[in-house]
Amino acid sequence: MTSTSPKSRRSSGKGRKGSKKKGKQVSQIPPLSKTPPSFRNRIVDKKALKQLVAWAYKNHGTAVTAAMADNLKDLGFKYATQAAVSISVDDLKVPDAKQDLLGEAEQQITATEECYRLGEITEVERHTKVIDTWTETNERLVDAVKKNFNQNDPLNSVWMMANSGARGNMSQVRQLVGMRGLMANPQGEIIDLPIRTNFREGLTVTEYVISSYGARKGLVDTALRTADSGYLTRRLVDVAQDVIVREEDCGTSRAILVKAEDGRFGNRLVGRLTAEQIVGDADEIIAKKDTAIDPELSKKIEKAGLAGIMVRSPLTCEATRSVCRKCYGWALAHNNLVDLGEAVGIIAAQSIGEPGTQLTMRTFHTGGVSTAETGVVRSTIAGKVEFGPNARVRGYRTPHGVEAQQAEVDFTLKVKPTGSGKTQTIEISNGSLIFVDNAQEIAADVTVAQITAGAVKKSVEKATKDVICDLAGQVRYESVIQPREVTDRQGNITLKAQRLGRLWVLAGDVYNLPPNARPVVKANSKVSKGMVLAEASQASEFGGEVRLRDSIGDSREVQIVTTSMTLKDFKLLEESTHTGEIWNLEAKDGTRYRLNSIPGSKISSGEIVAELADDRFRTKTGGLVKYAPGLAIKKARSAKNGFEVSNGGTLIWVPQETHEINKDISLLMIKDRQWIEAGTEVVKDIFSQTAGIVTVTQKNDILREIIVRSGEFHLCNESKVLERFEDEGQMVNPGENIAKGLKADSMVLVQTVESRDGKGLLLRPVEEYTIPDQAQLPELSHVKQEKGPSLGLRATQRLAFKDGELIKSVEGVELLKTQLILDTFETTPQMTVDVEVALDKRAKTINRLRLVILESILVRRDTMSDSSHGSTHTELQIKDNQLVNADDVVATTQILCKEDGIVQLPNAVDDEPIRRLIVERAQDTTVLTAKDNPILKVGERVVDGDLLSKGEPINCCGEVEDIKGNKVTLRLGRPYMVSPDSVLHVRDGDLVQRGDGLALLVFERQKTGDIVQGLPRIEELLEARRPRESAILCKKPGIVEIKQEEDDESVVVKVIESDDSLSEYSILLGRNVMVSDGQEVHAGEFLTDGPVNPHELLECFFGDLRDRKPLLEAAQESIAKLQHRLVTEVQNVYKSQGVSIDDKHIEVIVRQMTSKVRIEDAGDTTLLPGELIEIRQVEDTNQAISVTGGAPAEFTPVLLGITKASLNTDSFISAASFQETTRVLTEAAIEGKSDWLRGLKENVIIGRLIPAGTGFSGFVEELRAEAGPHPDILAEDPAGYRRMQNLRPDYTVEMPVSTAAKSTSVLDDPSEEDLEATRSRHGIDPTTSNFAAFARPSGDDPSQEDQKPDPIALEGLQEEGLLADE
């Protein structure tokens, strides 16, 4: 293929070829230059095509480019058809080198596993090494794939596709023909089992499952990402929608510096305008001020070798509430200066939001630090190592567990050849690792050192990993570990290793003992199979009668009756009813009790056992209850169970029938206050049971209730008598006179009642019930142990209703209940009482009720060979119905030995029972025979490869127990390496089972890509979130001094500032200090690692600059520093995912986030402290106030997240349509805000033309018309008025806003007295006239804009010489 270089401005031959083919389509193409195109021979891939199309577009416009692109497409298809490019499974060629590479990796991993088995490296180091080995193998395999295709099949369709950029990339090809590689589990941790096969060879089932972990995560991710990204775009649009290009040039002198990266600017300068003249080496002017930088100029600047260029940027633009054309630069759509009225804010928002879907949401955790082989230096010759004279090294252990040395200073290392040859010199920098010792003889191609570029402190975090035991046995520490007890803040004691060392687990058979078992064998005694090792017994607490129950599952219940109580005078009878079984107790005199708790149930103290079934206290209807004097009840907390009688007496009952109806009034069949007979139908289907006077209650034509009061009715017209018995009436005793000719025969309740015939007296019958002082208690018989609980019953009488209570009912009610209640003494809360049926001892046909307290003991059955418990053998020591005393043994359990061996007991800790013991069996030891005298000592621990005698290695690990002649007895064991500061879960001499945790390794791993990546990170930046544990930042510049505290846990970093003052920063546990002693630091520099808090960073910058510069400059500079930082951070996230966004888009958004300041002190302005206001407005206000000599407002810059910034815009319509609608609108209403409809959103909501694009010019005209005589309205908020209002009302001044505006007469600063005198002399009322009103209208109300100053007042001022004659 041939191509025209994008540099060449002549047309390519292809364009011509196409134009012949499609004459019609290309006829509008302007004639191209006649010079023959230069011939270039190079491969055109995706990138070159892009450049070609871009070149055509730039030089020849859209039509030509479209035609050319079409022709290119035809060309591509034509040749692809001729070449018959296709793709098939056979094109996926697996490189032959794959097997060897995998083999090598396997070998390395086997070696690593072996090191781990011998306790040379820790679990963490093993994991890290395995993962790194596979990562490296994968990389090498990718290279092999590339090499294979390049050499053997360069025209392979898969290779061409990936290589040209048409589809796919190397990482995908790698999975097709290399290996799929390492996968992460759902928690994001890398599984150390990689997928060795590729899709061409096919995956095994295990590999397939592991592989689909990641795939599923990807799918879920994509779904969430779309939503998140959409919301991000919405917030961005909201914050930037009112940024429109409104001015040609804001005339600012501020700019930003764009620095070259590795001497190159790339595309970062293209489309910007220079802020100053650019001068090259020989004072040649490369570009004048305000020149647009195109790619050619950008290359020129690069060639001139300039490190940085000052360019104009939206960040520094001083146009109010918009950006000007020159600060924005090119519109990237057509590579020309942006047009006026272009809505650049929305373009910026969409450019940042749209790629959001392409970012990952993943948060990664790798298992350990991934140290790629960076800067590894190998020896080129065989020779002797020599360190330079100033060399200082310290021991260091790499993350892979390799012992090495770390350089503390920069020095030179030489390898002097043993034979002939040139000396190899290696420059070692501070912090580099050296894998050889001084004066060591080494061979060629040995790894000598790993050079790090400077002492870069990486950001690390603490992580932990468990060490799990692989065999049962006894733990032994190596003395090196030096465990120490650490007490944390909660007072918990943990054991920590101080040094790197091994924990040994020496093999043996570990028996777990049941909770109350005790060993019956002595330490170090011999035991044989079937011997009893330990014994546990179960005893009765109180004693009593034994009952054996049938066994359930693998255990058997033994019940011991400690206490029982029988009701011996009552027969227990069972009745069947339609609701179920009912049990009754019947006494000899025929009184019956209903049993509340049926046999077989459990009850506790205070529960009701039975209730007297008694009809003596049952009424026929509802009525009124009255207590006669003498009847008393106990006070109770709740009346749920009625009122307990304390003193007996008489209960008086007045019957009254109440029908609760709730039906329509039309169904009523009688009249109110009518006398009716018993059996009368009062409402349809409801009949009265007694005769008497009816009272009907109704509400809203709904019948509520009908009351029938029975008795004799006598008409009466004596008012005194009627008054006496009004309301509730009175009780009248027999023989007492009620009225003339009316005497009571029996006790009655007399009430005054109105009937249909007139007023009269109703004599209501009364029933009396006598209540005894105490209820009768049945006879009981007890069986009780000496110590232990006892039972009792008590009888109580309870009244259901209180004095004066009215019971609304048709059916009768029970007034008094007699209950039997259970009482227990000296019981524990968990003891329950069982209800049982017992046969009478004499008459076997009669059942009696018995209440018993049982002690239940569960006895385990024999478990023949449960691996951890050994064989257990359980025996019951009692028989059924036997009587046992307190503390008698009920059952014993013996733990039997499974194999012959020697018993060892663990170290006894004070008073703690022994829970495990160990038997050392024959298979736990091995006898080695040495050819020569053994060179080992008893008690020494050895691993594979150690020498038994001279030249005779051992092939197992363990501890030497005995040496007889040349026979060595070795107890097998397994070492585990623990790193310093690991938490030990076991103590020396403890016994462990397989699978127990031995220790928790604490290690540091690199924070991978700050863990938060992609969308969440972008959101964190743009919302200016405060991270949870942010880095500690330096507040003022100075020299660092690091001091370790006594308790060795925390570090204090001191910074000695220029004025010799000290700032102390205490650093918490687990944070890494990122500075070194004596280092010079600047404000805002990191003292520890961790995510940065942008708000704190701004404070640091501002605090530092505030001391050295004027307020406004300090604010602008600190904001500029922060802006630069934010833009870079956002760019980094997108770049890491391969998305390119032009800086200016991010700048537009960041500008909106940093445009406000917070007023701290209002000075003489009318601003409010705490108010958020644009920095430009404060600047203008302060400038105005300074003319009059007033105190300016003090402020601090603030950073607002995009949501906050959207809610803080001047337009309340825009803010309300975004979030918190009610709050925003209420506040706006209370403050009486006006919305000036500047942005797009407000206008869209109201339905006006938007002030962008074609509507822009109309918008400017409209504003001018609105402004009337004050063209100022275009310049500022509610115009310059806002600035005028910010002054105290006693000053009048107007700042020249633009050169066009004539400067107005300026007041000197008159004193209060001067003003007062002037007012009085000219008869000005101080309440109506305000001097400041002469220079400004008094509000944002346009109707007041034409307000003219008061002519009398003006004259007065001129006469006083306080105002110039103009």
Swiss-Prot record:
Cofactor: binding comment: Binds 1 Zn(2+) ion per subunit.
GO cellular component: DNA-directed RNA polymerase complex
Family matches, as Pfam families: RNA_pol_Rpb1_3 (PF04983), RNA_pol_Rpb1_4 (PF05000), RNA_pol_Rpb1_5 (PF04998)
Domain of life: Bacteria
Biased composition (Polar residues): 25-38
Keyword NADP tagged: no
E.C. designation(s): 2.7.7.6
Residue ranges, annotated region (Disordered): 1-40, 1299-1366
Regions of compositional bias (Low complexity) in chain numbering: 1353-1366
UniProt catalytic activity: RNA(n) + a ribonucleoside 5'-triphosphate = RNA(n+1) + diphosphate
HAMAP family: RNApol_bact_RpoC2 (MF_01324)
Quaternary structure and interacting proteins, as annotated: In cyanobacteria the RNAP catalytic core is composed of 2 alpha, 1 beta, 1 beta', 1 gamma and 1 omega subunit. When a sigma factor is associated with the core the holoenzyme is formed, which can initiate transcription.
Protein family (similarity comment): Belongs to the RNA polymerase beta' chain family. RpoC2 subfamily.
Function, in words: DNA-dependent RNA polymerase catalyzes the transcription of DNA into RNA using the four ribonucleoside triphosphates as substrates.
UniProt name for this protein: DNA-directed RNA polymerase subunit beta'
Taxonomic lineage of the native organism: Bacteria, Bacillati, Cyanobacteriota, Cyanophyceae, Synechococcales
